[in-house]
Amino acid sequence: MAHQNEQRGGGDRGRGRGRGRDRDQERDDELVDKLVHINRVAKTVKGGRNFQFAALVVVGDTKGRVGFGQGKAREVPEAIRKATDEAKKNMIRVPLREGRTLHHDGKGRHGAGKVVLRAAPPGTGVIAGGPMRAVLETLGIQDVVAKSVGTSNPYNMIRATMDALKLQSSPRSVAAKRGLKVGDLVNRRDDGASSPEAIEA
């Protein structure tokens, strides 16, 4: 009898693991991935040079989560797979206003790259360059104006964009920090404040 109970218990645990895998698969099915850049790189070794492909991939759920990853391999598909897996592990959550744009304007930088993100009214669309557009669209933003200065390097542009997104704050979180009501912040933002600094002033 004890042996039978152990078997049943093991089966339950197995089914639990199966349900966990199913949930992970469902989450993966909801994700959108975009290949931003791929190039061939060479590494000098004692016997000569080894060539690999380097891939840059952005992954998001179009509902406020996004991440990016890099992968290297001798074959393009493997490099893309590695980059995609890394992007899934590095996803961040960004609060969106009305589920379509940013709560406030923001700036980000990485190395020589600088980006400016501006919240936009409905119908504006995603006005942004290639690497930035990939991040913003997979994040789920529908209306935004983005500008990049200082670099055309896709790696720096994406890192700078992610830097700007990490600084986004919703009225609820700002209100909690300031001990104010959300309604007060929203009213002040509608009067012309478009950044956390302006809201908190």
From Swiss-Prot:
Domain called S5 DRBM: residue spans: 31-94
InterPro entries: Ribosomal_Su5_D2-typ_SF, Ribosomal_uS5, Ribosomal_uS5_bac-type, Ribosomal_uS5_C, Ribosomal_uS5_N, Ribosomal_uS5_N_CS, Ribsml_uS5_D2-typ_fold_subgr
UniProt entry keywords in alphabetical sequence: Ribonucleoprotein, Ribosomal protein, RNA-binding, rRNA-binding
Annotated region (Disordered), positions in chain: 1-28, 173-201
Pfam families for the chain: Ribosomal_S5, Ribosomal_S5_C
Example of a GO MF term: rRNA binding
Ranges in a coiled coil: none
GO biological process, one term: translation
Entry keyword RNA-binding: yes
Annotated GO CC locations: small ribosomal subunit
Database matches in NCBIfam families: rpsE_bact
The record's note on its domains: The N-terminal domain interacts with the head of the 30S subunit; the C-terminal domain interacts with the body and contacts protein S4. The interaction surface between S4 and S5 is involved in control of translational fidelity.
Quaternary structure (record): Part of the 30S ribosomal subunit. Contacts proteins S4 and S8.
Family note: Belongs to the universal ribosomal protein uS5 family.
Task of the protein: With S4 and S12 plays an important role in translational accuracy.
Protein's UniProt name: Small ribosomal subunit protein uS5
Lineage of the species this protein comes from: Bacteria, Pseudomonadati, Pseudomonadota, Alphaproteobacteria, Maricaulales
